[in-house]
């Protein structure tokens, strides 16, 4: 009984952290057919000029995709054969877009923001992308 109560308490606290996240990601879930475009958005914490996008696969491995500072790209990977694109315009949500989704793109996509880009990252709740069948 005590173990069950502890589990419920932890789940409630984790849920509260997600609900109170200062980084807002939409949509929470995204289901696309192969070949379809997938777009996710992120509103960074107010006053945070540095924004990161990560991909977390089914093995819980994190892959850095891109980061911005004041709307300018600082670092990025090859953006997966140019199928991925991202932008972070001033006064608008940042976005990550996959032009032609593939099954291997199914993952949790996380946006994080930071004041300086070196520590104290604030993560959003993520967008879970599932790519199925044919478009």
Curated annotation (Swiss-Prot):
Name used for this protein in its record: T-cell receptor beta chain V region 3H.25
Disulfide bonds: 42-111
Record region (D segment): 116-118
Something else known: This T-cell clone expresses only a single V-beta chain segment although it has three rearrangements in the beta chain family.
GO biological process, one term: adaptive immune response
Pfam families: V-set (PF07686)
Region (V segment): 21-115
Keywords in alphabetical order: Adaptive immunity, Disulfide bond, Immunity, Immunoglobulin domain, Receptor, Signal, T cell receptor
CDD domains: IgV_TCR_beta
UniProt entry tagged with the keyword Disulfide bond: yes
Start and end residues of each stretch annotated as J segment: 119-135
């Amino acid at each position: 009984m005590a173990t069950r109560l502890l589990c419920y308490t932890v789940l409630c606290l984790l849920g509260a952290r997600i609900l109170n996240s200062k980084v807002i990601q939409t949509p929470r879930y995204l289901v696309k057919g192969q070949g379809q475009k997938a777009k996710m958005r992120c509103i960074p914490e107010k006053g945070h000029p540095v924004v990161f996008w990560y991909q977390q696969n089914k093995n819980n491995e994190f892959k850095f995709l891109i980061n911005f500072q004041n709307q300018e790209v600082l670092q990025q990977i090859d953006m997966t054969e140019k199928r991925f694109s991202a932008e972070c315009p001033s006064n608008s949500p940042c976005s990550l877009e996959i032009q032609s989704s593939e099954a291997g793109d199914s993952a949790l996509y996380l946006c994080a923001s930071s004041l300086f880009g070196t520590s104290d990252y604030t993560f959003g709740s993520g967008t879970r992308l599932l790519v199925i069948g044919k478009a």
